Amino acid sequence: MRSSIGARRALFDCQSMLAIIGGSGLTRLSTLAVAHREVVRTPYGEPSSALLFGQISGRDVVFLARHGHGHTIPPHRVNYRANLWALKNRGVGTILAVASVGGIAPAYRPGDLVLPHQLLDYTSGRETTFFDGSDRVVIHVDFTEPYSLALRVHCLAAATAGGIPLRDGGVYAAVSGPRLETAAEIDRLERDGATMVGMTGMPEAALARELGVDYAAIAVVVNQAAGRGASAHAISMASIAEVLETAMDQVRALIDQVVERVP
């Protein structure tokens, strides 16, 4: 066990690659010239999908489909630890994640892209840390700012350069899912300060921090949250699918711009 830990740490010494974690609506990157794919075995089981290695604009990029390539894994069953460990183990030092959210803030509209700066965690029943007492000394990582400021700056610059509307800042409330929320639950989240609600933001962000990986997320508003606006009485899954299909064009364009700017 000790020798495997040493080898693992050696692999983690040099991290330079950029990874994209695709969520609902983003199961592939059309501009990624895939060189090879690899199913990585981890101490935490198998990741959600094979890692796709390739290049975008001459830059090495890895892609992972959070819900599997057929979108078969619900948010509460995603193996977040395996996903993050696999990426780190293969040389990833920066992760840009994409996730769909419900808009709580009145200004948010379906199709908006938001770059959250804070989060609230309401999830339960998930493996939330690598420091589980099995073979690693516990480290209490600082999580004051859950998203990488440097990566957020690159995302904002990329959006400006590409003429892509991107809202700067927001508070992501992570819930367990897979069901959507009640109107009363959204009322509570709003009182707590949340501006959007999603199901995959945690423990993904915290695990990235534990591994020393820069992490930021692009949140795609796919509907107004329960009890709000067009979702006052019910949420239309057909409408969500339509929004995702349209919004992903902008997401892909933004990713291409970010790839050109991340060191």
Model-derived features with residue positions:
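Active-site rim beta-loop-alpha module in soluble metabolic enzymes
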Residues: 145-191
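N-terminal amphipathic/basic-hydrophobic helices that include classical n-h-c signal peptides
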Residues: 1-16
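Metabolite-binding pocket within alpha/beta catalytic cores that recognizes anionic/polar moieties
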Residues: 12-144
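Residue-level detector of anion-binding/catalytic polar loops
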Residues: 60, 93-94, 165, 195, ...
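Short, hinge-like loop/turn segments at secondary-structure boundaries
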Residues: 112-117, 214-217, 233-236
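Short, flexible loop segments at the rims of nucleotide/cofactor-binding pockets, characterized by
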Residues: 71-76, 173-176, 193-194
